[in-house]
């Protein structure tokens, strides 16, 4: 019986924390030429940065620096695939953001440089004041189209933190 008391009381004093640190991505990442988002609004630059960072953080992609891009095609007809093979790009992404009174629309086209073909060209809609979430959905679509695995940039994590004996329930968007 005494053993049972200790067995029930000891877990109250134990504390464990799980920390996952990603220090390296893929040894052979997909090389992507991300043409900066077209658009007039401030949402355009924000969306470009979010999508770029989401893809980099997966560890599966290498995004070419904007200064190393050799052309800025505005549509499928402007793409010269041999140019993109010169810099060893695997994929080319053309993107745009359209801001209107009814909301925001992001369009993106993914081109496989080796196969010289378009592999996806969807539109994603969202509310004007939530460019971040819309951008995460775009990132997920790009990730899934290239890897075949569902993206996780728009997922949510629920966690409980404790400080000064007060529990706080938090929901975060990643």
Task: Label every PLM stretch briefly.
Residues 18, 52, 76-141:
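Amphipathic beta-strand/beta-sheet edge segments enriched in Tyr/Trp
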Residues 99-101, 163-167:
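Short glycine/acidic-enriched loop and turn motifs that connect beta-strands
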Residues 21-82, 93:
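Short beta-strand->alpha-helix linker/helix-N-cap micro-motif
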Residues 143-153:
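Structural signature of eukaryotic scaffold interfaces centered on beta-propeller domains
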Residues 9-16:
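Hydrophobic h-region of N-terminal signal peptides that target proteins for export
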Residues 172-174:
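Conserved small/polar residues in nucleotide/adenosyl-binding loops
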Residues 94, 159-160:
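Residue position within the beta-strands of beta-propeller blades
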Residues 2-9:
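Sec-dependent signal peptide recognition
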